[in-house]
Curated annotation (Swiss-Prot):
It comes from Klebsiella pneumoniae (strain 342). The lineage of its organism: Bacteria, Pseudomonadati, Pseudomonadota, Gammaproteobacteria, Enterobacterales. InterPro entries: Glyco_trans_19 (IPR003835). One of its GO terms (biological process) is lipid A biosynthetic process. Condensation of UDP-2,3-diacylglucosamine and 2,3-diacylglucosamine-1-phosphate to form lipid A disaccharide, a precursor of lipid A, a phosphorylated glycolipid that anchors the lipopolysaccharide to the outer membrane of the cell. GO terms for molecular function: lipid-A-disaccharide synthase activity; phospholipid binding. Keywords: Glycosyltransferase, Lipid A biosynthesis, Lipid biosynthesis, Lipid metabolism, Transferase. The gene is lpxB. Its EC number is 2.4.1.182. This is Lipid-A-disaccharide synthase. It holds the Pfam family LpxB. One of its GO terms (cellular component) is membrane. Pathway: Glycolipid biosynthesis; lipid IV(A) biosynthesis; lipid IV(A) from (3R)-3-hydroxytetradecanoyl-[acyl-carrier-protein] and UDP-N-acetyl-alpha-D-glucosamine: step 5/6.
Length: 383
């Protein structure tokens, strides 16, 4: 008699963040079903957990329209090949991790062949291009969402969605150790500290750094002992920031860090940052913040017409109100930014209330996401 086939899960991750999620999911599934088989497109972390890589994740990690066009034939070939091979393999469940432009079409192809599909990490359909929700609904049996308002959005369109909490909320403590973070960064315990995070993309750093530095200069008038830390994602961004600083504030002392954004947030009394995942991380670090963002005028005009939400930062979207100041475009200028940061650095009622709300929101999205994702995969496999 033939051996029963082990549970087989196909996965496709297209970037580093997806590799981290995939590895966590595989680990949680292996703890319950040790002989489960995992195949697909995987990064080094997923492969270390035992995922058999038919293609390396780097093949899909392409940024920018020009780069995508240059690699389009190869990407279409990979998607067609995966459609065929997964169709022959008949996995119990297919999990597309993020990379929506690649994965949602692949999920649709597989669902048509009777393979159960999950899309892990909702694209920002609630914010813009909302009609994508119908394509997602046709392509997937289930969406796994990090944030509760994402589930509420899918529910409106009767697209099956499960809120599993956010892996970053699981990874970060409810009460971070500010003193230990300062020790790691060499910041004295008895001074005020401001973190500047002008973004991870070159265009953001170019657009925001000068105003962020001028803001810190204004705050130093009120707080002469203010320490300023600037975590930068890589050597390229550091070089870029150093050039802008030399032009804008050559005499100003700032501590530039290679990475270490999380420590910088935990160590600081307040942060000024570009929007994006950094705002969520800053909330989880319990660091009061102001979001400042500027883009090219036409891009901003277009964004205002396309974006359907009242807020741009995740803390405000989670709170359903303006919990943190969002100063965008013309409002993103040093005088206005400094005035918004002043009460946060004063360490009074405003920053205390923000800290308490951040803690409550952290608890709301801290749900053991890896385990929840594994539950969802196994439940769908049994259906």
């Amino acid at each position: 008699m033939a051996e029963p086939r082990p549970l087989t899960i196909a996965l496709v991750a297209g970037e580093t963040s997806g590799d981290i999620l995939g590895a966590g999911l595989i680990r949680a599934l292996k703890a319950r079903i040790p002989d489960a088989r995992f195949v697909g497109v995987a990064g080094p972390l997923m492969q270390a957990e035992g995922c058999e890589a038919w293609y390396e994740m780097e093949e899909l990690a392409v940024m920018g329209i020009v780069e995508v066009l240059g690699r389009l034939r190869r990407l279409l070939h990979i998607r067609a090949d995966l459609t065929r091979r997964f169709g022959e393999l008949r996995p119990d469940v297919f999990v597309g991790i993020d990379a929506p432009d690649f994965n949602i079409t692949l999920e649709g192809n597989l669902k048509k062949q009777g393979i159960k599909t999950i899309h892990y990490v909702s694209p920002s359909v609630w914010a813009w291009r909302q009609k994508r929700v119908f394509k997602i609904g046709r392509a997937t049996d289930l969406v796994l969402a990090f944030l509760p308002f994402e589930k509420a959005f899918y529910d409106k369109f009767n697209v099956p969605c499960r809120f599993i909490g956010h892996t970053m909320a699981d990874a970060m403590p409810l009460d971070p150790d500010k003193g230990a973070a300062r020790d790691r960064l060499g910041i004295p315990h008895n001074v005020r500290c401001l973190a500047l995070l002008p973004g991870s993309r070159g265009a953001e750093v170019e657009m925001l750094s000068a105003d962020f530095l001028k803001t810190a200069q204004l705050l130093r008038v009120t707080y002469p002992d203010l320490q300023v830390v600037v975590p930068l994602v890589n050597a390229k961004r550091r070089e870029q920031f150093e050039r802008i600083k030399a032009e804008t504030a050559p005499d100003m002392i700032v501590h530039m860090l290679d990475g270490q954004a999380r420590d910088a947030m935990i160590a600081s009394d307040a942060a000024l940052l570009a929007s994006g995942t950094a705002a969520l991380e800053c909330m989880l670090a319990k660091c009061p913040m102001v979001v400042g963002y500027r883009m090219k005028p036409f891009t901003f005009w277009l964004a205002k017409r396309l974006v359907k939400t009242d807020y741009v930062s995740l803390p405000n979207l989670l709170a359903g109100r303006e919990l943190v100041k969002e100063l965008l475009q013309d409002e993103c200028e040093p005088q206005v930014l400094a005035a918004a940061l002043q009460p946060l650095l004063a360490d009074g009622k405003t920053s205390h209330e923000m800290h308490e709300t951040f803690r409550a929101l952290h608890q709301q999205i801290r749900c053991n996401a890896d385990e929840q994702a594994a539950d969802a995969v196994l439940e769908l496999a049994k259906q």
